[in-house]
Curated annotation (Swiss-Prot):
The modification Cysteine methyl ester is found at C72. Keywords: Cell membrane, Lipoprotein, Membrane, Methylation, Prenylation, Transducer. Belongs to the G protein gamma family. A lipid is attached at C72 (S-geranylgeranyl cysteine). Its main location: membrane. It is found in: Cell membrane. Residues 73-75 form a propeptide. Brain. This is Guanine nucleotide-binding protein G(I)/G(S)/G(O) subunit gamma-4. CDD domains: GGL. Guanine nucleotide-binding proteins (G proteins) are involved as a modulator or transducer in various transmembrane signaling systems. The beta and gamma chains are required for the GTPase activity, for replacement of GDP by GTP, and for G protein-effector interaction. InterPro entries: G-protein_gamma-like_dom, GGL_sf, Gprotein-gamma. GO terms for cellular component: heterotrimeric G-protein complex; synapse.
Amino acid sequence: MKEGMSNNSTTSISQARKAVEQLKMEACMDRVKVSQAASDLLAYCEAHVREDPLIIPVPASENPFREKKFFCTIL
């Protein structure tokens, strides 16, 4: 019975060490305020609006997925 408790204790110590290492890594990361990230994202979207085919459609002549205008009839 004592071995089971020792093994369980070792496992929880190992998990705690991993958690501490993870928290140390996260504490060193640079953080950005949400308002700043949103502002940066908005500026990026506005700067690249002309390249976005969902906002400015691709000209039909350049669209590889356009409908073909050829009709085939079977007689």
